Amino acid sequence: MKRKLFSILSVFLLLTMLTSTVSAGGNIKLSGAFRLGSLIFDGTLTGVGGYTEGVTVTLTATGNPVVTCTNQGGSQAPGQNPPKVTTSGNQFIEPSDIDEKGKAGVSVETDEPVLTAKRAGCPSNRWTVSMVVYWTDANVVVTDSATGVRLLEQVYTCDPTQQTATSVSCTLVSETSFH
């Protein structure tokens, strides 16, 4: 009788431990919107309460630059056939930034893209490059900071024709949860 009771309690304890470990990560969801600076994603991340070392959010974006080349005398000329630019940025979300419900705010910004004057299509590298990027694609990836394991990936397509000086319209085209 004791052996049977011990076996039942052991199985129950094991199931309880497995359930709490599996649910530690929760059902990770990310919602938000894009805005401009370089490219910025602001939103809310949920289901990350069990990540004791925090999580990292990485934003990678690709776009078409419109380039203006300026020489030392101040004369300007458009760049010729500049290549697409890709840039990224990270935000580390510390455990203390995650509330008791497993929710955290997200504000991740890509670095400013850089093109040399020559790559931008300017006559020489002595010219100064200024550019506006019309974003076409964005990827947001959430990883476990302790293990580097990918938890969530969202892929967006951005509409350059809807971009203004301060806003951009990006549509979620796919979402993959890895946990």
PLM features: residue spans?
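Sec-dependent, cleavable N-terminal signal peptides
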Residues: 1-24
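Mature extracytoplasmic or otherwise solvent-exposed domains
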Residues: 24-179
